[in-house]
Amino acid sequence: DQGDRVTAQFLITGIGCISAGNVPDIKGLHSFQGEWYHTGSWPHEKVDFAGKRVAVIGTGSSGVQSIPVIAEQAGHLTVFQRTAQYTIPARHATVDRRFLEEEVKPNYAEILEKARWSHGGFPVDPSERSALEVTAEERLETYESGWAGGGFGFLFGSFKDLTTDRRANDTVSEFIRSKIREMVKDPETAEKLLPTDHPFGSKRTLIDTDY
């Protein structure tokens, strides 16, 4: 947009797969007298929600990631949800110099090889087992292990047929719903948060921290 021209042998764009913001056409939004923010265009300065009544519209990726942070600060938080979502804990860990030097750099080749041949390009060891060929106890143990590890490994590393066999998918979808019932103590609220209209993995998998 500055009129510059650049030539290169290779071009790698790192803008992400969803780079254009979508501001919904909500009646009265632009005449609203209070503060409002869009997660795709967040201000550089810190936003203070302390003691305020806050509403978050949407429980997509940005919603489930921002809601817990806002809830810690706001005096009252209301969430407007259209569609209940499957969401997996991220289990983020600190990336420090020791981690990079001792765990990442020595294993570059292996990490890249895993990503090259894995479904979706994630450096995860793919499972060769079907969710339907193991016992219920083994299946639950696998899901619990994946849940504890967090991230996309839960989907891509648990069983090979979660996105190709509806019966297999039903087992993981129900496991996630059981986790929601376990975390959300109010049964009525939990019921509203249970995704039932689509299989897990059929929409973009959401990764959260303390949602």
Regions found by a protein language model. Name each.
Residues 1-30, 45-46, 59, 74-211:
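N-terminal FAD-binding dinucleotide-binding subdomain shared by FAD-dependent oxidases/monooxygenases
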Residues 8, 34, 51:
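Active-site acidic short loop of glycosyltransferases
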Residues 63:
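N-terminal Rossmann-fold NAD(P) dinucleotide-binding loop
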Residues 66-70:
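Aromatic pocket-lining residues of Rossmann-like dinucleotide-binding sites
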Residues 37-51:
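A short, basic/flexible loop-to-alpha-helix module at the beginning of a structural domain
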